[in-house]
Amino acid sequence: MESLRGNTAQGPTNEEDYKNEGQLSRQTKCPAQKKSSFENTVVRKVSVTLKEIFTGEEGPESSEFSLSPNLDAQQKIPKGHGSPISRKNSKDNSDLIKHQRLFSQRKPCKCNECEKAFSYQSDLLVHSRIHGGEKPFECNKCGKSFSRSTHLIEHQRTHTGEKPYECNECGKAFSRSTHLSLHQRIHTGEKPYECSECGKAFSRSTNLSQHQRTHTQERPYKCNECGKAFGDRSTIIQHQRIHTGENPYECSKCGKAFSWISSLTEHQRTHTGENPYECSECGKVFSRSSSLTEHQRIHSGEKPHECRVCGKGFSRSSSLIIHQRTHTGEKPYKCNDCGKAFCQSSTLIRHQHLHTKE
């Protein structure tokens, strides 16, 4: 049995060593990884042996299973006498079983609530917290709780300001690896989420969901103050700040405050002059991704914003709003000098020049 416990650091390294020494490294390796034909033979035999030791199932070899045809009779392992190795290598074997599931895609751990399956019991335990509402991981700064320790770690970075994930292209840093992955699609142009209705593609699944509501006209998020409905949750949160007057995001350069962090980020580019969004057709650059999207419609001819009254299409939502005033008669822009009203702010500005000339 001592020969089976050979030193892993100085154990045999080739077939000749095995023949001469009759030893076997105790390191458990995965058969799915590439190896020489000799290594594959040894690992396959080790896997069968471990299966017999831990499950009692007999492998394809004889009941008295030898690790190598060159091992003498004293080095053979009789069935039922594997307990010392079992105790010694139980952790190695469990790690091997877990690792092999990556290749087999076997998911034996099934949720009783929703039938979702997992490779490991630990993953099932974490998943079950969705149904039970359990959030055992609490932030010691603000008291917010989470169902996963990884979510707590990510949250704590909002307090520490730590951003360990950096973009290799532009150097921008993020607190979450998922945010970095999403950001990198700006550089690669990858848009894996495609609309089944019109074929338009998006870099984020949330953007696809929001877009699909332009086809369904679904607006599930309703404001309790004014009854206005929205297609996505983030927009209603931003809208509600109109009622509360909350502007939590302040510019460190000029002190101007904003209700939305993306608005602050876009505003800060007026100080830095940064224009990170470039049109692939003509090379024109923009400080906002939305401005680039609207500009690209000049090249594509896309007009996704359609008037429900007359069916006329527009490339910008703001252009549709202005157009709709021709149907409603609304003229929200009024001249302070003569009281004349206009449906567009630009028309009011042109009109006011008449008074200044006078």
From Swiss-Prot:
Q: Which UniProt keywords apply?
A: DNA-binding, Metal-binding, Nucleus, Repeat, Transcription, Transcription regulation, Zinc, Zinc-finger
Ranges of biased composition (kind: Polar residues): 1-13, 22-38, 63-73
Keyword Ion transport among record annotations: no
Which segments does the record annotate as C2H2-type zinc fingers?
109-131, 137-159, 165-187, 193-215, 221-243, 249-271, 277-299, 305-327, 333-355
- Grouped into one coarse class, the protein's main location is nucleus
Taken from the UniProt record, the cysteine pairs bridged by disulfide bonds within this chain are none
Quote the subcellular location field of this record.
Answer: Nucleus
The answer to whether keyword Repeat applies is: yes
Set out the biological process GO terms recorded for this chain's protein: regulation of transcription by RNA polymerase II
What one GO molecular function would you report for this record?
A: RNA polymerase II transcription regulatory region sequence-specific DNA binding
One Pfam family recorded for the sequence: zf-C2H2
Question: For the region Disordered, what residue ranges are annotated?
Answer: 1-38, 56-94
Q: SUPFAM superfamilies in the record, alphabetically?
A: beta-beta-alpha zinc fingers
What are its GO cellular component terms? Answer: nucleus
The protein's job, in short, is:
May be involved in transcriptional regulation.
Regarding protein family, the annotation reads: Belongs to the krueppel C2H2-type zinc-finger protein family.
| Record-given protein name | Zinc finger protein 391
Question: Gene name on record?
Answer: ZNF391
